[in-house]
From Swiss-Prot:
HAMAP family xref list: UPF0178
Organism encoding this protein: Idiomarina loihiensis (strain ATCC BAA-735 / DSM 15497 / L2-TR)
Protein name: UPF0178 protein IL2341
Disulphide connectivity of cysteines: none
UniProt-listed Pfam families: DUF188 (PF02639)
Family the entry assigns: Belongs to the UPF0178 family.
InterPro entries xref list: UPF0178
Length: 147
């Protein structure tokens, strides 16, 4: 299993959990972003800087990932694409995207986009909480235990 982070929008606290997990389990972890992100020195942790532009990092993750890899992202369309390739997708809040729930999540996302386009302000997600961090770490541990 290889780990990929959609790193431009991934909270620092979640990246740090992933750094520790990659070291502990000796799994390769790729941070894919259009800006340089500081990483610890490790033969398991790699920074992949892509050009700027819409979905450039997402396309790179889809290109690189394989079945049974784990992608950390809150980007629903990216999660859908990697699931179609047989990979797993986990949000920074600990929600596992699956073939069974991804279509519903895409529909909700599209509905919210339509509402925003019509001028209705929906606000963004709340800040990452300690409960979110724990949910993420617990779910990550369960996924890595099966690798």
């Amino acid at each position: 299993m290889t780990l990929f982070i959609d790193a431009d929008a991934c909270p620092v606290a979640i990246r740090e959990i992933l750094f520790r997990a990659a070291q502990r389990k000796q799994l390769h972890l790729y941070l894919v972003a259009n800006q340089r992100i500081q990483t610890p020195k490790s033969k398991f942790i790699h920074m992949v800087q892509v050009g700027s532009g819409f979905d450039v990092a997402d396309h790179e993750i889809v290109r690189r990932c394989e079945a049974d890899d784990l992608i950390i992202t809150s980007d629903i369309p990216l999660a859908s694409e990697v699931i179609d390739k047989g990979a797993k997708a986990l949000s920074p809040r600990g929600e596992l995207f699956t073939p069974d729930n991804i279509r519903q999540r895409l529909n909700i996302r599209d509905f919210m986009d339509t509402m925003r386009s019509s001028g209705i302000q929906s606000g963004g997600p709340p800040p990452l909480s300690n409960v979110d961090r724990k949910n993420f770490a617990d779910h990550l541990d369960r996924l890595l235990a099966g690798s």
